[in-house]
């Protein structure tokens, strides 16, 4: 019974069933997010014989307008397809193999990040689900698996067996115990991993611990509609991030040695410190993600009045080439994107809220200190400290060249609209630039917007270490005290 209920709970996702009333209505969302409760309820609910709403789970009832016809419509979606035959291999606990054919048969998972689904406890202690539209680039698409063996994993202990033996892996409502990494480093070439339900983690007070690690070739990592990956950040947040305080996982989702692959349509919330570390990848595309660390904006008992989350970078990118990050929404408390090394990198269609903007750096003092060919384009930076920033570490060496910011809209920026600093230290800038890191061929095109405070432009270069900066269609207003020691003509 448990097995068939689990398979049934994914039918509206696999077959793309939409709410008959209106797409995006909270009734559809609650059936996706509360899939177990919905499946159990729908198994006995019949609109023709049940017209009262007594006994209906409050989470389903309140989000379906207290109307049995809406409940019935959503239940009909759950039952529109036949449940496939499921074989449970005795050698792999909690892994359900749903196909194992000699000729691979493709399958489709409908995915979307058009809405953020907030789950909160109502006064009655039932789960209330509210779908809140946000200014996030819509990334709704269909993912087609590669056929072969498809496995559904419901227990952490079964992940390693599935990684070794399955072409397509559906991770359903996984709880990773303390000190237990979701290790996806041994994936088969061409494998697909699909997150479903809510993925959660036990407490692990260790800065060297990585909750999720993935690598592979021609791999796809994605999520079905309504899934949530929750990093348990509130257990660690103390206002200090990686700068001090208690030990906490430094990078939540580590992507390394990944080639010709895609990561798409994931919803991640409440990561402890940095979210993604992208390292040593080639021809990797990351698309349509929602990173929501908004809960970390509030102070807690450990943060001394400051936001509880700190150093919560969305994406840290290093030693990677031909990397694309696109159509992604980030609400955090540090760099939205930070490129510290790599070549041929495109960051396009970003919505960055609450953090430190679109950054190159900091550069210097690392194993690789070269950034060549990075384009940030068609993006918004909102209610953040900085808009477009290049930062190099004081007293270190390296090189930054061929950087382009194009069609970037800024709003409510508090510190710097455009910021190039060669005096950077994590504890604070020195005010004295050094010239060990060269910065050349930097272009700002159609970078526009407004400041709430701070400086529209701040450029502090070392002696002869900056060259060939171009400003075209740049207009940032609302700040004061602009200061640019390069170019010789002054600030834009």
Curated annotation (Swiss-Prot):
PbH1 repeats lie at residues 216-238, 258-280, 281-319, 320-341, 371-392, 400-422, 434-478. It comes from the Eukaryota. Its EC number is 3.2.1.15. The keyword Glycoprotein applies. Pfam families: Glyco_hydro_28. One of its GO terms (biological process) is pectin catabolic process. One of its GO terms (molecular function) is polygalacturonase activity. It catalyses: (1,4-alpha-D-galacturonosyl)n+m + H2O = (1,4-alpha-D-galacturonosyl)n + (1,4-alpha-D-galacturonosyl)m. It is found in: Secreted. InterPro entries: Glyco_hydro_28, Glycosyl_hydrlase_28, PbH1, Pectin_lyas_fold, Pectin_lyase_fold/virulence. The active site is at residues 334, 356. Residues 1-16 form the signal peptide. One of its GO terms (cellular component) is extracellular region. The keyword Oxidoreductase does not apply. Glycans are attached at residues 292, 407, 441. Keywords: Cell wall biogenesis/degradation, Disulfide bond, Glycoprotein, Glycosidase, Hydrolase, Repeat, Secreted, Signal. Involved in maceration and soft-rotting of plant tissue. Hydrolyzes the 1,4-alpha glycosidic bonds of de-esterified pectate in the smooth region of the plant cell wall. Belongs to the glycosyl hydrolase 28 family. This is Probable endopolygalacturonase D. It comes from Aspergillus flavus (strain ATCC 200026 / FGSC A1120 / IAM 13836 / NRRL 3357 / JCM 12722 / SRRC 167). The gene is pgaD.
């Amino acid at each position: 019974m448990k097995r068939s209920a689990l398979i049934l709970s994914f039918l509206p996702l696999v077959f793309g069933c939409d709410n008959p009333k209106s797409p995006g209505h909270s009734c559809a969302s609650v059936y996706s997010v509360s899939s177990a409760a919905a499946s159990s309820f729908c198994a006995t609910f019949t609109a023709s014989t049940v017209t009262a709403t007594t006994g209906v789970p409050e989470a389903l009832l309140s989000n379906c307008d207290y109307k049995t016809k809406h409940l019935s419509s959503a239940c009909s979606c759950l039952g529109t397809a036949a449940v496939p035959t499921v074989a449970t291999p005795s050698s792999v606990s909690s892994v359900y193999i749903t196909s194992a054919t000699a000729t691979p048969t493709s399958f489709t998972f409908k995915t979307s990040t058009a809405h953020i689904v907030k789950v909160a406890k109502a006064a009655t202690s039932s789960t209330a689900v509210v779908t809140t539209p946000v200014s996030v680039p819509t990334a709704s698409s269909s993912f087609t698996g590669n056929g072969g063996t498809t496995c559904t994993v419901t227990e952490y202990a079964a992940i390693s067996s599935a990684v070794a033996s399955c072409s397509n892996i559906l991770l359903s409502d996984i709880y990773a115990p303390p000190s237990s990494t979701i290790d996806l480093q041994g994936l088969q070439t061409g494998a697909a991993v699909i997150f479903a339900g809510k993925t959660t983690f036990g407490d692990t007070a260790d800065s060297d611990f990585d909750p999720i690690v993935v690598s592979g070739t021609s791999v796809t990592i994605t999520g079905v509609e309504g899934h949530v990956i929750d990093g348990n950040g509130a257990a660690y947040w103390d206002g200090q991030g990686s700068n001090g305080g208690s030990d906490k996982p430094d990078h939540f989702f580590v992507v390394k040695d990944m080639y010709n692959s895609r990561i798409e349509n994931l919803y991640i919330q409440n990561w402890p410190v940095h979210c993604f570390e992208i390292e040593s990848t080639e021809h990797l595309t990351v698309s349509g993600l929602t990173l929501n660390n908004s809960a970390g904006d509030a102070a807690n008992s450990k943060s001394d009045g400051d936001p509880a989350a700190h150093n919560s970078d969305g994406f840290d990118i290093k030693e990677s080439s031909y990397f694309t990050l696109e159509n992604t929404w980030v609400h955090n408390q540090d760099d939205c994107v930070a490129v510290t090394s790599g070549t041929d990198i495109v960051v396009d269609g970003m919505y960055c809220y609450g953090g430190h903007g679109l950054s190159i750096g900091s550069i210097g003092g690392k194993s690789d200190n070269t950034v060549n060919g990075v384009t940030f384009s068609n993006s918004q930076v909102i209610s953040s400290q900085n808009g477009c920033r290049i930062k190099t570490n004081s007293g270190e060496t390296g090189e930054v060249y061929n950087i382009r910011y194009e069609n970037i809209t800024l709003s409510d920026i508090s510190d710097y609209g455009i910021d190039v600093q060669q005096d950077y230290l994590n504890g604070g800038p020195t005010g004295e630039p050094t010239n060990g890191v060269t910065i050349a061929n930097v272009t700002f095109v159609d970078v526009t917007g407004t400041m709430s405070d701070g400086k529209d432009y701040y450029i502090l270069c070392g002696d002869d270490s900056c060259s060939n900066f171009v400003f075209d269609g740049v207009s940032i207003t609302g700040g004061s005290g602009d200061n640019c020691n390069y170019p010789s003509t002054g600030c834009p």
